[in-house]
Amino acid sequence: MSFNEGDTTWIILAGGLVFLMIPALALFEAGLLRKKNAVSVFMQIFFGLGFLSIMWFLFGFSLSFGPDQANGFIGNLDYAFFKNIPLNEPLDYAKTIPGISFVQLQMVVAVVTPLLLTGVIAERMKFSSFVIFIGAWSIFIYYPLAHWIWGGGWLAQLGVADFAGGIVIHTSAGMSAIAAAIVLGRRRDFGPAIMVPHNIPIAVFGAALLWLGWFGFNAGSALATGALAANTITVTHMASAAAALVWIGLSWKRTGKPSVVSGINGALAGLVGITAISGFVSIEYAVLIGTGIGFASYAGLIIFKQKLRIDDALDVSSVHGISGIVGSLAIGIFASTMINPAGPNGALFGNFSQFGSQLLGVGVAIILGFGGTWIILKVLKAINGIRVSDKIEDIGLDLGEHAEEAYADEEEYKIGDKEYQNQKKRSGLSEE
């Protein structure tokens, strides 16, 4: 079969842009954490890249996008081990590209999604528990939600729309973050100590790469080149720009100083919030939506962290959860078939029922994300424990869990086993 070369090239490129978001996320998070925990987040994300890719190969893609079974609940195992995925034929989801190109794009999306939760569990979760957690979260939360909405499952059959993941990815991850923060508990020095970012330039660089990668994340969901993909990129950019300015303005008013950390968090909130509706909305409405997302997510930050004192280390609950909810519900108001004939109309264009469908999808993601994460972590806590010891938390996960440092002291640096023992001594973990 002859494929559309332009579409195929774009999807391959989009997959590369989404892949870029994985190291970008590590840079963003590591820069905002304290120095003693920088290596730990790189380890979590790099391990997740390999582990979640293999899970996708074994059964993840098949459960998410395989032929429907159990009345729209989950896919079957026809595509397990990538069997029955043709090299020279398309899948039904994208008729103009090779089936394996669709699989690859969805794989990097499935990798980056659970890794968003590294932002909430930072500086206190055991690595062994992290491994089990992201695996269980993918199986019990991400794969079912992906099938329900993108794989032709029961929510899709009820009219729920989500262009690139506002419900499937960000609402579920944001609500999971609240549950994870509650079950894990606050960091030992949360509150009394000022937990300042250790390297803001690295965080800004990571945020800029995330912004770039998001063009592939959102516009790749068009699954083709052309006007829709082009509009989606511009919509994504403008919403992020608007939200970034809102966060900078609000933090400036609140503290008296303009903050670049607020700016990058606001940009990320805008990228998250526009994800669900990016392929259904005009540019002018995208600016309006991005502005609203900025206000809503900043308010969420104040409520969750400062009023309720939920220790969500990097504010996944507000930046992803609140933003994802607002953008997903916005489909019910601003979506237009003039932008995407395959999508829905919102209330502004005569379809008043779409908002109800979006409420349903968001509600299901909230319940599954929060409830599923709560259950997973409670079971894991009983079986394996989920927090590092107080001693390891105090010295940092880099030395305590990995015997490595982000910024080694050259005078004390040793080679091989001696280096490992030296780090153990400095960390206070050596029995010598």
Feature locations, PLM:
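Glycine- and aromatic-enriched membrane alpha-helices
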Residues: 1-432
